[in-house]
């Protein structure tokens, strides 16, 4: 039997939107936790190095790893699409795949940046990898809970998911698209302002 590219992307993207934020929380938590566990953070600030530089360097490393990981996931998805397409078991062309790539890129960018910054704040406030991991799991579930809500655009991960799915099926976007788009963009900007203060 054949399946559509849009359905396959829907399945993959649902898994991505739930589990990827959890992975990012654990990643950024681990990067900072190593500093606290090895007491290298104390050395860093005792020698007069900027705490802000340390924070931004860890966030940058996590963002780069997160973007690379998301790219690898989409490349693996592309290989699966190529295999299924070659076997004649997939409907949907290259034009749809390219649109999905744009949508996924937008979603991954928003999720990586917002989640990494949020995770960095949680680990620096708690200094506990378990607390950070639990908050990451909660954030992943909360993002997924708001995906279907018409007010879900206030959660950046939920908004990014709906934007991504718009490239697959326009009917999955918000009923009031202009207000939701403006609100979602404002929520992302607001998150960045709060996270970088």
What positions do the PLM features span?
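Short glycine/serine/threonine-biased micro-segments
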Residues: 46, 117, 134
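Terminal transmembrane helical anchor/hairpin motif
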Residues: 1-11, 133-197
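Transmembrane alpha-helical segments in integral membrane proteins
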Residues: 20-36, 41, 113-131, 187-197
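Helix-loop-helix units of permease transmembrane domains in multi-pass membrane transporters
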Residues: 31-64
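Short N-terminal micro-motifs specific to bacterial/archaeal maturation
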Residues: 16, 32, 45-46, 151, ...
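Secretory targeting signals
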Residues: 1-26, 56-125, 166-183
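Membrane-interfacial segments
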Residues: 33-36, 40, 80-92, 126, ...
